[in-house]
Amino acid sequence: MSREKVYNFSAGPSMMPESVLNKAGSEISDYMGSGMSVMEMSHRSSLFGEIFAETKRKLRDALNVPDSHEILFLQGGATLQFAAIPLNLMGSGKCADYAVTGNFSGLAAKEAEKYGSVHIACDSSDRGHSYIPSELSLSAASSYFYYCANNTIYGTEWQSVPDTKGKTIVCDMSSDILSKPVDVSKFGLIYAGAQKNMAPAGLTVVIVDKALAGRQMDICPSV
């Protein structure tokens, strides 16, 4: 029975290429002759290890991620990073700069306040988040600067990476990752919920500079 193709233009989940859907469908019960579905195999098996390594390699190649940065595939949705980032990056100074230019950056700043001091580097709420501020006010005490690259609700997007004078940059790229070239080396951490531009919902991609390891707070859970 034929059916009319439905085109989804919502903010997420994103549409999948038909070739990808067909390939996934054909292998749902027997992945590459293994006799089992990917959903059934052990995550510690060599075959799943190959899937994981290939996925990582393809993303590293697509974004030209340097060896200085690690790629993580995490659970919990992108909003989990609202807490995970300050818990792991605020450090002993417990201070961070946040650019509030939309709904999600505002929520991220509010969550970060639970773990330390949040300095608002810029705020576009005075005009309904209809613009990206041209200037930043950075705190000398902050350990990183946070911003959301593309604001789907308000329709604004940062056209270039903000100049933070060397301060670590953290960016939520959930809605524009893989849409254009990005110099990953400029960022301490990039994260993105997979469902808008990359894959089905349920996965968050984090790309983090290995040099930032070891800054976690004592209260950071071991998960």
Feature map (PLM): residue ranges:
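Conserved active-site segment immediately N-terminal to the catalytic lysine
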Residues: 170, 184-195, 204
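Conserved N-terminal alpha-helix of the aminotransferase class I/II PLP-enzyme fold
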Residues: 34-81, 88, 102-103, 110-111
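PLP-dependent aminotransferase-like
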Residues: 79-145
